[in-house]
Amino acid sequence: LGLSKAYLHEDQFFPGWTVLVFHRHVTELFQLAPPERVQLIEEVSRVAGALSEIYHAKKINYELLGNQLPHIHWHLIPRLPDDPAPLEPVWRVPHPPVHLTGVMLQHTIDRVRSALREKR
């Protein structure tokens, strides 16, 4: 990725939940120059496509809010066939947090990186 960095969200109750963070501080999408905006949307799409492929998602939720953290960043959330609350936004689904550690965390990161390499 050129303008952003992708991170797995610390809570993986919704498997594959990824946060894509723009490389410099900007609070609004319209503040970007058109070429940057186009490239950033391409990066969002590339990561979303990789997540969809890895997790066989029925849908990817795209969240670009910024109320709590005023910096351009997307939450990309694969919604799976066995989703526990398919009609609800993830923020409204009470759940115990799921934290990946060690081998599982590295395996997940490696899968995403591999899928992104294929999406170039």
Where do the language-model regions lie?
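HIT superfamily nucleotide-processing domains
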Residues: 1-120
